Amino acid sequence: MTKRKGKFLLAALICLVLCFIWGNSMLSGEESGAVSGGLLDWLTGTFPFLGWLPEYLLRKFGHFSEFSLLGFLLAWFFLLWDRQWLHRLALPLLFGMTAALTDETIQSFSPGRCPSVTDVWIDVAGVCTGIAVLSLCFSLYLLLQKRKGMSNEKVI
């Protein structure tokens, strides 16, 4: 896959993840509760050892995991655009924080929902985790390539 196609694919995936996140934020409180409750029922039915899991914790984990994926994809996207480490880290974080704030703003207009500063912090922690995972994967990739004798100029 060419670098250009990779950028396009990552941009499309980022847009899909944002549509999923923001689409869930547009649900009313009742609809959102029904989705969370259905997922919790499925999880506890499939994995009985999760019977202790409260819906509140499931919702917070949902925020964290959605934004971890977003952070990973954003970091990968900016890795393809710019090779400077500051840009690779700062731009995905900035975009992720903006997405988190937008998410909570959308919720403020959804019936039965209200924005939460706690959710913004959970979302940003997810973005940071995604960026860290991508950074670790890329560092390991560079290390393996270096051991094989490839120069960094041939990477990406």
Describe the function of each predicted region.
Residues 16-21, 89-108:
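Small-polar-interrupted transmembrane alpha-helices in polytopic inner-membrane proteins
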Residues 4-9, 83-93, 116-117:
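Membrane-helix interface segments
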Residues 2-74:
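"…centered on the first transmembrane helix and the immediately adjacent amphipathic helix/loop
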Residues 100-125:
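Interfacial helix-loop-helix junctions of multi-pass membrane proteins
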Residues 147-156:
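Short, charged juxtamembrane terminal tails flanking transmembrane helices
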Residues 66-80, 127-142:
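Membrane-interfacial alpha-helical segments at the cytosolic side of multi-pass membrane proteins
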Residues 30, 77-85, 109-113, 136, ...:
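Membrane-interface elements of multi-pass transporters and channels
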